[in-house]
Curated annotation (Swiss-Prot):
Active site, UniProt feature: D68, E133 (proton acceptor)
An example Gene Ontology molecular-function term: acetylornithine deacetylase activity
UniProt organism field: Coxiella burnetii (strain RSA 331 / Henzerling II)
EC numbers for this chain: 3.5.1.18
Pathway: Amino-acid biosynthesis; L-lysine biosynthesis via DAP pathway; LL-2,6-diaminopimelate from (S)-tetrahydrodipicolinate (succinylase route): step 3/3
Enzyme class per UniProt: hydrolase
Protein name: Succinyl-diaminopimelate desuccinylase
UniProt remark on cofactor binding: Binds 2 Zn(2+) or Co(2+) ions per subunit.
Length: 374
């Protein structure tokens, strides 16, 4: 059994449902320490984090990832227990197999092998690992990055081991991510009897035109690196608990996924202009869960693409598709950030799995990238 597969199995066996680490980080730390890495536990609240490094020079390349996973859902729908790593037809099944325990296993084994072969290597290799990526992401990577900045540690390059590939390992890498902003909107009307609408002010009726305008607004055209900004309602609630009452309020929640084309303030102002145009009485609360980032095709991305070409014989597609990742926190330091990991088709799904043959290739890509960088 390969070292990467063996480590992945050990990690899948730990039911590390966010924010519980379930002992995964102890396994990783013990392995890294055995080849000379220095490691620091950095717990914040109930979240487990660690920071590890080997070397004392620049450039500083970081591997980043998370040990937490989403809940397995209805376990009767799995063909094998979600926390029992199961090999079948060339694949290994288990919660976290794709997102992202395979990435973690491959990164750690690649770093081990590199340090064993190059004990006095140039540069510094580091790890940022958290158990708070699938949850609120408040006490995880963000706090570790703050800690490193307080210590004046300058990061140069970062590979996040998220499942970035689409159909084949290495066919895509992320060189940026859109931002995410939520709005909680309350439309204020006047409660009344449904038989006497002239004595009430129905917030549901009042909202229709404004909501249609928001849904149909073209916020931007996107650009060569980012798709157009997306606006989606995801929850609308109204009602007074009785069929003969016009409610006093309507509550709606919506989300923006946006490129660096806009600031959050610009989007907020545009929403409020639309609401004001339709003369709505409203209250709105905003929550910016992540800012967009774009690292572009820098030195790290160039070497990653070379490594993928050499090992997988693919011309990878750099893109910014998908949701958010912890790369957004690391990018705030000015570090070049890319995401490179396994195929993402089964992430968060029942019967999550990863191709076993891809594990060795992914390990080799990480190893080759280290060779090219330092």
């Amino acid at each position: 059994m390969s070292e990467t597969l063996n480590l992945l199995k050990q990690l899948i066996e730990r039911p590390s449902i966010t924010p519980n680490d379930a002992g995964c980080q102890t396994i990783l730390i013990d392995r890294l320490k055995s080849v000379g890495f220095q490691c620091e536990h950095l717990p914040f609240g109930e979240v487990h984090n660690f920071w590890a490094w080997h070397g004392h020079q620049s450039p500083f390349i970081i591997f980043a990832g998370h040990t937490d996973v989403v809940p397995p859902g209805d376990e009767t729908q799995w063909h094998s227990p979600p926390f029992t790593p199961t090999e079948k037809n060339g694949y290994i099944y288990g919660r976290g197999a794709a997102d992202m325990k395979s990435g973690l296993a491959a990164m750690v084994v690649a770093a081990e092998n590199f340090v064993k072969q190059n004990p006095d290597h140039n540069g510094t290799i580091g790890f940022i690992v958290t158990s708070d990526e699938e949850g609120p992401a408040e006490n995880g990577t963000q706090k570790v990055v703050d800690y490193l900045q307080q210590k004046n540690i300058k990061l140069d390059y970062c590979i996040v081991g998220e499942a970035s590939s689409n159909e084949k390992l290495g066919d895509a890498i992320k060189i940026g991510r859109r931002g995410s902003m939520h709005g909680e909107l309350t439309i204020i009307g006047k409660q009344g009897h449904i038989a006497y609408p002239h004595l009430a002010d129905n917030p549901i009726h009042r909202s229709f035109q404004a909501f249609e305008a928001l849904a149909k607004t073209k916020w931007d055209e996107g650009n060569e690196h980012f798709t157009p900004t997306s606006f989606q309602f995801y929850n609308v609630e109204a009602g007074a608990g009785a069929a003969n009452v016009i409610p006093a309020t309507l509550k709606a929640k919506f989300n923006f996924r946006f490129a660096p084309i806009h600031t959050t303030q610009q989007l907020q102002q545009k929403v409020e202009r639309i609401l004001n145009y339709y003369q709505l009485n409203y209250d709105i609360q905003w929550n910016v869960s992540s800012q967009p980032f774009f690292s572009g095709n820098g030195r790290l991305a160039t070497f990653v693409r070379q490594a993928i070409q050499e090992i997988c014989h693919l011309n990878t597609e750099p893109n910014t598709y998908g949701g958010t990742s912890d790369g957004r926190f690391i990018a705030t330091t000015g570090c070049e950030v890319i995401e490179l990991g396994p195929v993402n088709k089964t992430a968060h799904h029942v019967n999550e799995n990863i191709c076993i043959a891809d594990l060795e290739k992914l390990t080799d890509i990480y190893f080759r990238t280290l060779q090219l960088l330092i």
